[in-house]
Amino acid sequence: MSVSVIVMGAGGRMGTTITGMVRADGECRLAGVVEREGRREGLEHLGCQVAGTLEELLPGMPDAVVIDFTAPEASVHNARACARHGSGLVIGTTGFTEEQKAELADCALQTPVFWAPNMSVGVNVLLKILPQLVTLLGEQYDLEMVELHHNKKKDSPSGTALRLAECLAEARKWDLDTVANYHREGIIGERPHEEIGIQTIRGGDVVGVHTVYALGPGERIEVTHQAHSRETFAAGAIRAAKWLAQNRPGKLYTMSDML
């Protein structure tokens, strides 16, 4: 069965990648794209409906699955629209507040909603194995993280870095809000044991690099994930759209559910 897909922000870097891969996927059909005025040039060649808002498309495409890598406020707005029309929604947006996440969860009770701060299969496998690594190493090892992204990225730290940090904190039974350190400067004293340093680098056109450090007596372990192209995230989002089309509302689905 072919899955109809609507792509939000189709004129952007991520949107362009997703639309191209949806069109090349034999199990999907590009039903429509959404982009604001002034960024729609070239979208008419896609052979689908082009609109300025999601609400223009959903009434005529109730079975379509929407893929959204836009911005937190826009994604929440789109989740509300999908909930009204019963359309599935795959979200790759990062930077949500706790209140916005709660609203997405509410929408997921009315229509299928899938959210992952990173659509890469590799990152999500990393989230599975990190707790075991941290537990086996024991309390003697300090935990640190560095994330690197392109100079256009708006949120810091990345959503992936925060999820990785949550994973580390959960393995140690710590509260991330209490132990996270995003900035070190000046005479700050010795490093507390219950701390996870999260450092950010921005520059160039780097798609995404995340490195977790476990630093112990006489040795250091580094676990790095590098995304070489946006196609990694687009492929994960398309896979999620196909999976979501077969599922019902009831919870905010994540990569753990799909994998």
From Swiss-Prot:
It is an enzyme of class 1 (oxidoreductase). NAD(+) binds at residues 9-14, 35, 92-94, 116-119. NADP(+) binds at residue 36. (S)-2,3,4,5-tetrahydrodipicolinate binds at residues 150, 159-160. GO terms for biological process: diaminopimelate biosynthetic process; lysine biosynthetic process via diaminopimelate. GO terms for cellular component: cytoplasm. Gene3D superfamilies: Dihydrodipicolinate Reductase, domain 2, NAD(P)-binding Rossmann-like Domain. Its EC number is 1.17.1.8. The active site is at residues 149, 153. It holds the Pfam family DapB_N. It is found in: Cytoplasm. CDD domains: DHDPR_N. It catalyses: (S)-2,3,4,5-tetrahydrodipicolinate + NAD(+) + H2O = (2S,4S)-4-hydroxy-2,3,4,5-tetrahydrodipicolinate + NADH + H(+); (S)-2,3,4,5-tetrahydrodipicolinate + NADP(+) + H2O = (2S,4S)-4-hydroxy-2,3,4,5-tetrahydrodipicolinate + NADPH + H(+). Pathway: Amino-acid biosynthesis; L-lysine biosynthesis via DAP pathway; (S)-tetrahydrodipicolinate from L-aspartate: step 4/4. Keywords: Amino-acid biosynthesis, Cytoplasm, Diaminopimelate biosynthesis, Lysine biosynthesis, NAD, NADP, Oxidoreductase. GO terms for molecular function: 4-hydroxy-tetrahydrodipicolinate reductase; NAD binding; NADP binding; oxidoreductase activity, acting on CH or CH2 groups, NAD or NADP as acceptor. Belongs to the DapB family. Catalyzes the conversion of 4-hydroxy-tetrahydrodipicolinate (HTPA) to tetrahydrodipicolinate. This is 4-hydroxy-tetrahydrodipicolinate reductase. It comes from Oleidesulfovibrio alaskensis (strain ATCC BAA-1058 / DSM 17464 / G20) (Desulfovibrio alaskensis). The gene is dapB.
